[in-house]
Swiss-Prot record:
Positions of modified residues (Pyrrolidone carboxylic acid): Q7
Name of the protein in its database record: Mu-conotoxin SmIIIA
Disulfide-bonded cysteines: C9-C21, C10-C27, C16-C28
Annotated source species: Conus stercusmuscarum (Fly-specked cone)
Role according to the record: Mu-conotoxins block voltage-gated sodium channels (Nav). This toxin blocks rNav1.5/SCN5A (IC(50) is 1.3 uM), rNav1.6/SCN8A (IC(50) is 160 nM), rNav1.7/SCN9A (IC(50) is 1.3 uM), rNav1.1/SCN1A (K(d) is 3.8 nM), rNav1.2/SCN2A (K(d) is 1.3 nM), rNav1.4/SCN4A (K(d) is 0.22 nM), rNav1.6/SCN8A (K(d) is 69 nM), and rNav1.7/SCN9A (K(d) is 260 nM). This toxin is very potent but weakly discriminating among sodium channels. The block of these channels is modified when beta-subunits are coexpressed with alpha subunits.
Alphabetized GO MF terms: sodium channel inhibitor activity; toxin activity
Tissue spec: Expressed by the venom duct.
More info: All peptide bonds in this toxin adopt the trans conformation.
Endpoints of the signal sequence: none
UniProt entry keywords in alphabetical sequence: Amidation, Cleavage on pair of basic residues, Disulfide bond, Ion channel impairing toxin, Neurotoxin, Pyrrolidone carboxylic acid, Secreted, Toxin, Voltage-gated sodium channel impairing toxin
Location(s) in or outside the cell: Secreted
C-alpha cells in the first residue's frame, strides 16, 4: 500500500530523488 511506497522512498537513495517521495516521505526532506 501507500505505506510501503513511502518506506521504499526511505530505503533507496534513488527514491528520494523522485518528487513524490520528497513530498510524501518523511525520510526524504519533509520532516
Amino acid at each position: 500500500p501507500l505505506f510501503d511506497k513511502r518506506q521504499r522512498c526511505c530505503n533507496g537513495r534513488r527514491g528520494c530523488s523522485s518528487r513524490w517521495c520528497r513530498d510524501h516521505s518523511r525520510c526524504c526532506g519533509r520532516r
